């Protein structure tokens, strides 16, 4: 497309200075232009660095000719880049680069209008996600708020609960706004969607509904599920009370169709509901391992396209695990009669479970006895299910609202953890989440009653992988596990102190006297305080790694929501590569083909270790990290153990056994490529065309379309 020989003039380099948008003057650096052009070309056309260098030379030549000796603005330089791309035949690249600039300019203008010029930068992808799913629109579909206005809307709504306790609404609104607008803390998506609006939709992410063994009971739960999903919440169910397929139904003299058949009805209903909503529906189906239909349940998602709105998990008991270890039979129970229906080899069922998890990622496992050992209100009820991603065990009808602290914002200048800032953020976040309970318009009266009685909240973290990178600690190391454990311990201890203080101010949760906390706290506002959620979408808004997951890629192409592709490079890696002198377009091309730094020449070993990605990490390290956080987390931890495509059945069994041994409350595996539809696809190290790609809303963890509710 470019004729180098037609360019006769030499580059004089008379442009020496550039004026930044904040007014600062810096030295002109051609490399920045070349890098920007390379990323734009590579994202759209897959062109090489030679083309980028050639176009960059033409840009410099034009700047010298038109603006010799002048100090140029960023906008002027970018205008010339757009013009040059078009003139050299790269019309599509020029158009997409121009659109990218316009989106960035739009956001800067909004910040200026609202007086928050010091606010952290939202990424282009964060803006796309916010605009498509979060920001309010009028009846004509026109956007009527900015990201900053969204944060202020939510802050004011949540702070309004202070009037119930004589608090300072304005002061708390500003405090809540500060931690959200600085991306230090974000609540779960339903709170961002609905707080401060007139929709009367709920603010909680997590719900569990009971299913009674009758047609009326089943369809009552179906109706309740629809009401919850309409507001953006996700629902967990325990199907274990439903009689097994083939069992007698006395009222009709017929036979029961079993839990799996009814799961299909719930799945179909969710499909209809999500068609008119902003988010995919999300559900968790749990079945006890001693249910008569356990084998049918284990294979329920073996075929692609079945039960796509469900995560499914087997509730595994200690007794079953002992039977597996001892190669014994165990009893299956008839839910209707509570009597033994038949016996099965525990080993056989275990192997079926492992095989299907290896084959498709489903089912996961919930260690239900471990969950109930930590039930804060055992006299109130038994926990049988969790929210869709498994991190929030709940009683029947109970709900919980979640929020996560961005750990990448909790560092001092020397990249050590700023414990004082983390403490302050925890206390503000606990108050925020407790307030949500009071202003929440509950979809069901039963949910309101049990939620207000226990006042569970789930404060967690995101950006953990970014924090480790800043600290120079590889994810798959004992040091990283120690850091994870210390953070979890600190967050839970401080959240407990914050809840105790709120209990003294406002009163303990009504079931406090029946809880495990009586005698351990003088007062306590919340039955639980901490949860590690996957934070899929809110971590994109915050511009950090998701939950406690490792990086999924160092460089990749992101398919953004308008159909274009953006070249994304981890910003810390980019800065480090430039500082250490190994940054080049050739290195970037190699990284984007495979997503990681393995075997890429020129990258120092210490850098390669710090930027280790999920599929490079041995499965045991995934489990150890989950266990480290679970040790001090009051609810549960959502994390995916990512396995390479060539992982064996034995690898899956080792993961499940280690998770049980280390007292995880559940475990989920995903073997790369085991589902046809993935939102993350790795490139080929030796291929020229195939690169690592990710969908707009993928931030890490399980690389398939999943729950959009918890974060």
Question: Can you say where each PLM-predicted feature lies in the sequence?
Answer:
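Core nucleic-acid recognition elements
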Residues: 1-17, 24, 47-157, 162, ...
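Short, surface-exposed, low-complexity cationic segments
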Residues: 29-48, 152-160, 546
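Terminal amphipathic helices with adjacent charged low-complexity linkers/tails
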Residues: 90, 96-110, 315-316, 320, ...
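Conserved, charged catalytic cores of large soluble enzymes
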Residues: 109-173, 197, 242, 251-265, ...
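Conserved oxyanion/phosphate-binding beta-strand-loop segments in alpha/beta enzyme cores
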Residues: 119-127, 133, 162-200, 226, ...
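Function-dense linear segments that define catalytic or interfacial modules
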Residues: 155-164, 177-251, 255, 259-262, ...
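Catalytic alpha/beta core of large soluble enzyme barrels
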Residues: 197, 384, 390-393, 433-438, ...
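Internal maturation/activation junctions in enzymes
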Residues: 222, 425-448, 452, 456, ...
């Amino acid at each position: 497309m470019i004729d180098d020989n037609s360019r006769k003039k030499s580059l004089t380099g008379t442009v020496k200075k550039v004026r930044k948008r904040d007014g600062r003057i810096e030295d002109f650096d051609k490399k920045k232009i070349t890098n920007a052009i390379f990323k734009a070309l590579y994202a759209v056309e897959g062109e090489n660095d030679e083309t980028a260098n050639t176009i960059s030379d033409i840009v410099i030549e034009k700047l010298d000719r038109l603006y010799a000796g002048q100090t140029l603005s960023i906008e002027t330089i970018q205008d010339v880049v757009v013009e040059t791309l078009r003139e050299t035949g790269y019309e599509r690249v020029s158009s997409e680069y121009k659109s990218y600039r316009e989106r960035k300019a739009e956001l800067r203008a909004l910040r200026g209008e609202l007086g928050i010029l010091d606010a952290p930068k939202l990424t282009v992808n964060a803006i796309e996600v916010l605009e498509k799913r979060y920001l309010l629109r009028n009846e004509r579909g026109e956007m009527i708020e900015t990201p900053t206005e969204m944060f202020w809307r939510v802050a004011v709504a949540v702070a309004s609960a202070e009037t119930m306790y004589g608090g300072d609404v304005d002061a708390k609104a500003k405090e809540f706004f500060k931690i959200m607008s600085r991306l230090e803390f974000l609540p779960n998506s339903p709170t961002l969607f609905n707080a401060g609006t007139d929709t009367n939709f709920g603010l909680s992410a997590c719900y569990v509904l009971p299913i009674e063994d009758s047609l009326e009971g089943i369809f009552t739960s179906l109706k309740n599920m629809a009401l919850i999903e309409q507001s953006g919440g996700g629902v967990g169910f325990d199907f274990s009370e439903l009689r097994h397929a083939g069992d007698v139904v006395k009222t009709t003299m017929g036979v029961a169709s079993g839990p799996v058949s009814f799961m299909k009805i719930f799945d179909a209903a969710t499909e209809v509901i999500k068609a008119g909503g902003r988010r995919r529906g999300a559900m968790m189906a749990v079945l006890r391992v001693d249910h008569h239909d356990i084998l049918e349940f284990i294979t329920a998602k073996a075929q692609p396209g079945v039960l796509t709105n469900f995560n499914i998990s087997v509730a595994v008991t200690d007794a079953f695990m002992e039977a597996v270890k001892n190669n014994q039979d165990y009893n299956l129970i008839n839910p209707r009669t509570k009597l033994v229906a038949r016996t099965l080899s525990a080993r056989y069922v275990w192997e079926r479970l492992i095989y299907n998890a290896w084959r498709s990622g489903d089912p996961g496992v919930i260690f239900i006895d471990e969950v109930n050992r930590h039930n804060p209100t055992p006299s109130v009820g038994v926990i049988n299910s969790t929210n869709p991603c498994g991190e929030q065990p709940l009683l029947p009808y109970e709900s919980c609202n979640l929020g996560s602290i961005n750990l990448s914002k909790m560092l001092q200048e020397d990249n050590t953890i700023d414990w004082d800032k983390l403490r302050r953020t925890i206390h503000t976040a606990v108050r925020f989440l407790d307030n949500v309970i009071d202003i929440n318009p509950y979809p069901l009266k039963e949910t309101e009653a049990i939620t207000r009685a226990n006042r569970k909240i789930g404060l967690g973290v995101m950006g953990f992988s970014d924090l480790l990178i800043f600290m120079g600690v590889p994810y798959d190391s004992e040091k990283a596990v120690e850091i994870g454990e210390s953070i979890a311990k600190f967050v839970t201890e401080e959240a407990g102190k914050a809840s105790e203080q709120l209990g003294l101010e406002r009163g303990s949760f009504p079931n406090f006297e029946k809880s495990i906390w009586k005698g351990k706290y003088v007062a306590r506002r919340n039955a639980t305080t901490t949860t590690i959620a996957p934070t899929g979408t809110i971590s994109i808004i915050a511009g950090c790694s998701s939950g406690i997951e490792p990086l999924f890629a160092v460089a990749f192409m992101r398919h953004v929501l308008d159909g274009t592709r953006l070249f994304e490079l981890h910003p810390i890696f980019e800065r480090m590569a430039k500082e250490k002198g190994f940054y080049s377009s050739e290195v970037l091309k190699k990284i984007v083909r495979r997503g990681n730094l393995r075997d890429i020449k020129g990258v120092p070993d210490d850098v390669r270790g710090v930027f280790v990605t999920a599929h490079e990490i041995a499965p045991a390290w995934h489990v150890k990290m989950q266990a480290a956080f679970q040790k001090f987390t009051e609810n549960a931890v959502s994390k995916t153990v990512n396995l390479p495509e060539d992982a064996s059945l034995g690898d899956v069994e080792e993961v499940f056994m280690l998770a049980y041994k280390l007292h995880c409350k559940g475990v989920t595996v995903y073997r790369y490529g085991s589902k046809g539809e993935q939102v993350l696809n790795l490139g080929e190290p030796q291929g020229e065309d195939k690169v690592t790609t990710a969908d707009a809303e993928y931030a890490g963890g399980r690389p398939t379309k999943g729950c959009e509710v918890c974060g």
